[in-house]
């Protein structure tokens, strides 16, 4: 027995030795300071960093290592089989405007105008890569986009505006880093497949991460604070020059918020109640290619906008599950589903579809009282097959009887944003142009009096309410039905079970 154990241990030791030797051979370390980087925050280190990357790539790949220090840099050009490792205490700083020549200029990759400037250019970034494979950005250090712009004024504006920008890449890992003031986009991934973003902490003032036309994506354990734009945003633009779906995506164990920029990472969590922070998880607005097979779970929203699923440029948004979400201090609609016809894309593209979505196990507290949750298609194009169950939402209230008669604008061709619809006639859910929606085990609460109904259904077919609990308010109805067909009510609203076959208008 002892001889067998000795032989087994010897084999294990030999195998480990071979694996370790292989790791050393294929994962050499290239310290940027050995290539001339100073890391003192005053001398430009762009050339030294890119020299280290080129040296590693020439040898087949490796890890480009940043020890503790402040590295002032312009555009860093990634290559295949390269890992950038920012060690604890290392800060990579985007050089300010007077060092504009340190950045690569925006390339003219596509000539359509179906998307914003930022979605048509990738090279004008702090870190960028194109047509690469097997790349990583890891470590406990920080990327500070000090010199990055939060927007660009037009096609002739050459200023850098992104922290990390990847185009048509595969097998990508971004892990453990912190990011501050990350530009127009903290992470812009366009046409990137097999992408993992894990344990990233970002405190910025525009989009945190935009995942555009990507497939097989895992976002996990991330904290994104973005008061003036979206935190985690899935898109499917025309940025590749053709439509491509964003699909097979999981977003799990993440936190999004809208505190003042910089106050998330420093732990002060400052609020500015003079504006409505964004900072949410969203699909859209760019929606040419579609969104398919998406799972969002175990996420926290705090002091920000609510969940938004939007397709307005002809794409199909389908087969989506959203589960185990908590929200607190939400400044507009806690749930926003929008099928529209903005149609920023090739002429002749038909209106898209929004269907087969399940939203469950949601708790939202202190939700803005002006607009309830909004689920809205457009005439001739219904949202289909929506299931909402096990949801508790507590609204601030404050609505009036007069507001219960508000006609909500259609905005069929407009930009999809909850605030543009104004005050809704329901404090809870406003549902319009939907075929197939179920509400099961829903609890709505009011933090102050509200004289609007809990639900308004307009031009809706095949709706069901089961175990829906709303506040008892003397002399006020809970449900308005307008131009509605086949509505089933079971043990809900404290009323008798009933089925409404077809009605032009009724209050219940």
Predicted regions and their residues:
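Sec-dependent N-terminal signal peptides
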Residues: 4-14
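Extracellular/periplasmic carbohydrate-active domains that bind, remodel
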Residues: 12, 17-508
């Amino acid at each position: 027995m002892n001889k067998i154990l000795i032989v087994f241990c010897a084999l294990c030791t030999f195998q480990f030795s071979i694996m370790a030797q292989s790791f050393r051979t294929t994962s050499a370390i290239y310290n940027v300071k050995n290539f001339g980087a100073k890391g003192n925050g005053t001398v430009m280190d762009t050339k030294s960093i890119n020299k280290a990357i080129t040296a590693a790539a020439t040898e087949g790949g490796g890890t480009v290592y940043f020890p503790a220090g402040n590295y002032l840099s312009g555009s860093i050009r990634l290559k295949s089989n390269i890992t950038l490792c920012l060690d604890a205490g290392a800060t990579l700083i985007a050089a300010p405007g007077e060092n504009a020549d340190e950045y690569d200029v925006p390339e003219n990759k596509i000539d359509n105008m179906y998307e914003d400037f930022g979605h048509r250019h990738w090279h004008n970034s702090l870190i960028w890569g194109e047509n690469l494979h097997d790349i990583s950005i890891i470590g406990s250090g920080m990327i500070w986009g000090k010199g990055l712009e939060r927007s660009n004024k037009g096609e002739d504006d050459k200023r850098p505006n992104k922290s990390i920008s990847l185009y048509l890449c595969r097998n990508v890992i971004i892990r453990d880093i912190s990011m501050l003031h990350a530009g127009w986009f903290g992470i812009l991934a366009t046409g990137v497949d097999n992408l993992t973003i894990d344990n990233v902490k970002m405190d910025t003032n525009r989009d945190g991460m935009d995942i555009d036309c990507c497939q097989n994506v895992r976002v996990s354990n991330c904290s994104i604070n973005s008061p003036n734009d979206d935190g985690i945003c899935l898109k499917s633009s025309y940025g590749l020059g053709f439509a491509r779906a964003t699909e097979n995506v999981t977003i799990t164990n993440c936190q999004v918020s809208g505190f003042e920029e910089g106050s998330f990472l420093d732990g002060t969590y400052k609020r500015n109640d003079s504006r409505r922070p964004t900072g949410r998880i969203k699909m859209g607005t760019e929606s040419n290619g579609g969104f398919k097979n998406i799972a969002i779970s175990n996420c926290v929203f705090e002091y920000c906008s609510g969940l938004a699923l939007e397709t307005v440029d002809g794409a199909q948004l389908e087969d989506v599950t959203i589960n185990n979400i908590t929200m607190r201090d939400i400044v507009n609609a806690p749930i926003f589903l929008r099928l529209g016809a903005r149609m920023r894309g090739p002429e002749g593209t038909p209106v898209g579809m929004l269907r087969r979505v399940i939203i469950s196990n949601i708790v939202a507290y202190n939700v803005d009282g002006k607009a309830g949750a909004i689920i809205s298609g457009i005439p001739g194009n219904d949202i289909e097959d929506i299931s909402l169950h096990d949801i508790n939402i507590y609204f601030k209230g404050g609505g009036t009887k007069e507001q219960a008669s508000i006609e909500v604008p259609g905005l069929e061709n407009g930009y999809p944003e909850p605030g543009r619809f104004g005050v809704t006639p329901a404090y809870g859910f406003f549902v319009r142009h939907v075929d197939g929606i179920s509400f099961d085990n829903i609890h709505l609460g009011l933090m102050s009096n509200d004289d609007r109904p809990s639900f308004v259904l307009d031009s809706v077919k095949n709706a069901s309410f089961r175990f829906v609990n709303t506040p008892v308010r003397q002399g006020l109805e809970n449900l308005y039905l307008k131009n509605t067909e086949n509505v089933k009510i079971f043990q809900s609203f404290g009323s008798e079970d009933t089925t409404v076959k077809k009605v032009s208008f009724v209050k219940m």
